[in-house]
């Protein structure tokens, strides 16, 4: 909390909000970070209240990412971290979101989110990461990196699945007087 307060003090007036999320213990995370523990409900509530208190002190509202909606009672905004409103404020444009737009994952109300990477390719080595199986597999994959390839790692290989990503604009071009 002391570190968060120091960061909040430095960023005061420079950011619109802060997003918090608690560690999810995926199988890969358990394997790579065995000492990690699930953050219990009471600890989540305590930490959220403290983040909100500190955030208020420095003008930084706290939002949660895919967490228990009950954290709203602790003062956090639980509506999502990449909502229509957030994106409109960031871009200065109105958006018209199709009704069929689905959430990225259960409990998520964010509009944007696509996997653009590949498992076992990040070399940062964060022990809580869900995207890497282990360091050895990452090192093996990195050997195939080709800066001239449109692929993140190497080129097309047997068994690769390529998904066409439909890109559509949600920009609302309708002019308004008010």
Regions flagged by a language model, labelled:
Residues 1-51:
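Conserved AdoMet/S-adenosylmethionine-binding subsite of the radical SAM
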Residues 14, 57-58, 125:
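Structured helix-beta-strand junction loops
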Residues 25, 69-70, 134:
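Short, solvent-exposed loop/turn segments at secondary-structure junctions
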Residues 31-33, 38-109:
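A C-terminal junction/extension of Radical SAM enzymes
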Residues 106, 114-133:
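Local cysteine-cluster metal-coordination motifs and their immediate loop/turn environment
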Residues 132-178:
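Short Fe-S-cluster ligation motifs
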